[in-house]
């Protein structure tokens, strides 16, 4: 190829080329380049889109002068002879690209309809899969197919208008909200469809082949279900090509650019949703290490989930966590060191939870704060602004729904260890009547752990409000009524106790009541009497401490105020065995006892791990010793060994 004085050398790119130096020229496959300088060594200089630079000559081919422009219906457009109008070239290219968009939309719509009518609808009427699995496979593909038919009709209407009045970009923008909703929903369902394909691959493959699909049939179905993603990725490229050959003053140019940006964002969102749903499906189906409580499937459906970075109050350490929002709680998980599974870190009830969106600073970006009367303050940093918006919106909506279903009286200032009030019971003047059954809300009592997350959950029964209505009262901290067998013992206590309290412990009774013969027969055995005596000691200790607190605090409250339960002050009798073998009976608070028991459990777990490790090492050593002994015995019995050692 040589350049002559009569005509300039024009070439077409055979491959994409991306510049690595400032003096090089970038181009895409099919671009037309005007060569300005030909040098030996494989690098030429040329001009493309107003830029001049060097490019490899083996990436292009020469456009011969005999090649002429073709009609818009052809797939390629040849370089015109010298002197041909450039505007006509752009118009011809524009028509070619527009026709290509319309034809591929027709083809895509027919492919979706074919997958539905040939395979999925017959599969729905057959008994190969359950109705749930079939619905996972179909997803909302029917809605997408109907939408694509509407899109094709809209594009056809655009092409009927004169070129200067065609609004292809405006057509895409007007349908973008509906398209976004449909494709995001399809992406969210696709991981479940893939799971069904994997689990029932053999049955589905046989069914597809009976319907005329080529072998392997499962591959045909997998490809058909992936077509929406493949088509979505092509829109930005097609619109970019249309914009390149559009006149600068075309009224649709700005809408085309907006459509390109919208499709790029939609494609990125779809990929993110698919990854998030795949991770969510993995968490829900695989076992979680150190899991506590009921099975994760009993928590309901996942409202939202993502990977975040958390930082607990008073700590500088930041940890990566996976947060999953369920209807009534927020689940926190961490990934195992080798990313082979997930580890349970804790649950946070949405009841009483407060969400505060934070401004960006040097220490955190895209962050919000979780706080509450029963929740240790947690700083959550999201990966991007969209993730932050989703979390704040879902959590605020969830906490509002929870607060409506479980109405509570919010205190003005409450320490983190206290419990919020519970739903109001009927007025105290109806205390003699049968109490109304209410479902108490559960709360989490925070205590120190390796991850700083609350674990212990305590349920409290419905309580009566004080006579004087207040926004917050210590009477809301009283415990649930004792069980009826224990309540019978309370009846034998000092009758000087408040009659109002006794009415809560026992149903309305006659002034003088004697134990029946049946009750006397039940308590006749020695074992029953010993058990009752032990229970009575616990109740006596409780009543003694309660009376003492009531006497000390009588100056700060009315005498008619009911007794309260403060977890940090409530005492119980604990029997401990010291290291020297001496048994000591001590009085400890409930909180201290819970923490002490937790520490003991952790020590037992560590001891168990050490014993298990020692046992494994001993077993390995015994196996090695056994192998060595067998080898020695074999050598001793080997005749060849005897000859060599004579």
From Swiss-Prot:
InterPro entries: BetaPIX_SH3, DBL_dom_sf, DH_dom, GDS_CDC24_CS, GEF6/7_CC, PH-like_dom_sf, PH_Cool_Pix, PH_domain
Signal peptide limits: none
Origin superkingdom: Eukaryota
Compositional bias (Basic residues): 500-512
Modification type Phosphoserine: residues: 7, 71, 79, 340, 516, 560
Cellular compartments annotated: Cell junction, Focal adhesion; Cell projection, Ruffle; Cytoplasm, Cell cortex; Cell projection, Lamellipodium
SH3 domain sequence ranges: 6-65
GO terms under cellular component: cell cortex; centrosome; cytoplasm; cytosol; focal adhesion; GABA-ergic synapse; growth cone; lamellipodium
Bias-annotated ranges (Polar residues): 415-428
Keyword Cell division found: no
Disordered, as annotated region: 402-464, 500-520
The protein's role, per its UniProt record: Acts as a RAC1 guanine nucleotide exchange factor (GEF) and can induce membrane ruffling. Functions in cell migration, attachment and cell spreading. Promotes targeting of RAC1 to focal adhesions. May function as a positive regulator of apoptosis. Downstream of NMDA receptors and CaMKK-CaMK1 signaling cascade, promotes the formation of spines and synapses in hippocampal neurons.
Protein name, UniProt field: Rho guanine nucleotide exchange factor 7
Gene: Arhgef7
């Amino acid at each position: 190829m040589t350049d002559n004085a009569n005509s300039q050398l024009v070439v077409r790119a055979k491959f994409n080329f991306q510049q690595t130096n400032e003096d090089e020229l970038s181009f895409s496959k099919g671009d037309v380049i005007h060569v300005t300088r030909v040098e030996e060594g494989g690098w030429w200089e040329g001009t493309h889109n107003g830029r001049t630079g060097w490019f490899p000559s083996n990436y292009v081919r020469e456009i011969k002068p005999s090649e002429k422009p073709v009609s818009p219906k052809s797939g390629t457009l040849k370089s015109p002879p010298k002197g041909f109008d450039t505007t006509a070239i752009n118009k011809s290219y524009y028509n070619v690209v527009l026709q290509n968009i319309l034809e591929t939309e027709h083809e895509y719509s027919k492919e979706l309809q074919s997958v539905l009518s040939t395979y999925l609808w017959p599969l729905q009427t057959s008994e190969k899969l359950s109705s749930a699995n079939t619905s996972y496979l179909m997803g909302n593909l029917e809605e997408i197919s109907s939408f694509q038919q509407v899109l094709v009709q809209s594009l056809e209407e655009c092409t009927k208008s004169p070129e200067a009045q065609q609004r292809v970009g405006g057509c895409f923008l007007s349908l973008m909200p509906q398209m976004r909703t449909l494709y995001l929903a399809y992406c969210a369902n696709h991981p479940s469809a893939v799971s069904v394909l994997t689990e029932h691959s053999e049955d589905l493959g046989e069914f597809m082949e009976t319907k005329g699909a080529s072998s392997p049939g499962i591959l045909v179905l997998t490809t058909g279900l992936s077509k929406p993603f493949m088509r979505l990725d092509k829109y930005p490229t097609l619109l970019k090509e249309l914009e390149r050959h559009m006149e600068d003053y075309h009224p649709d140019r700005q809408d085309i650019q907006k459509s390109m940006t919208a499709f790029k964002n939609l494609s990125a969102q779809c990929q993110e949703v698919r990854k998030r749903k795949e991770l969510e499906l993995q968490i829900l189906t695989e076992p979680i290490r150190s899991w506590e409580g009921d099975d994760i499937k009993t928590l309901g459906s996942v409202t939202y989930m993502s990977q975040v970075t958390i930082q607990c109050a008073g700590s500088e350490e930041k940890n990566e966590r996976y947060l999953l929002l369920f209807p009534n709680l927020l689940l926190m998980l961490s990934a195992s060191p080798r990313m082979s599974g997930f580890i349970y870190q804790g649950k946070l009830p949405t009841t009483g939870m407060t969400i505060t969106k934070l401004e960006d600073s040097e220490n955190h970006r895209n962050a919000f704060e979780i706080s509450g009367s029963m929740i240790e303050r947690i700083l959550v940093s999201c990966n991007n602004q969209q993730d932050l918006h989703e979390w704040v919106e879902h959590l605020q909506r969830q906490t509002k729904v929870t607060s409506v279903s479980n109405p509570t009286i919010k205190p003005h200032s409450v320490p983190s260890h206290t419990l919020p009030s519970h739903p109001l019971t009927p007025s105290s003047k109806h205390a003699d009547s049968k109490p109304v059954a209410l479902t108490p809300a559960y709360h989490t009592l925070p205590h120190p752990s390796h991850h700083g997350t609350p674990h212990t959950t305590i349920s409290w029964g419905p309580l009566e409000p004080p006579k004087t209505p207040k926004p917050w009262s210590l009477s809301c901290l009283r415990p649930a009524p004792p069980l009826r067998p224990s309540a019978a013992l309370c009846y034998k206590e000092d009758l000087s106790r408040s009659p109002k309290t006794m009415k809560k412990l026992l149903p309305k009774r006659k002034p003088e009541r004697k134990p029946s013969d049946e009750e006397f027969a039940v308590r006749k055995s020695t074992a029953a009497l010993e058990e009752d005596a032990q229970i009575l000691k616990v109740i006596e200790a409780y009543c003694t401490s309660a009376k003492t607190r009531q006497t000390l605090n009588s100056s700060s409250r009315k005498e008619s105020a009911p007794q309260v339960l403060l977890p940090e002050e409530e005492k119980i009798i604990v029997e401990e065995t010291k290291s020297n073998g001496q048994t000591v009976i001590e009085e400890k608070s409930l909180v201290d006892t819970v923490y002490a028991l937790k520490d003991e459990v952790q020590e037992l777990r560590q001891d168990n791990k050490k014993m298990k490790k020692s046992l494994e090492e001993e077993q390995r050593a015994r196996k090695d010793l056994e192998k060595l002994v067998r080898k020695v015995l074999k050598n001793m019995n080997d005749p060849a060994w005897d000859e060599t050692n004579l």
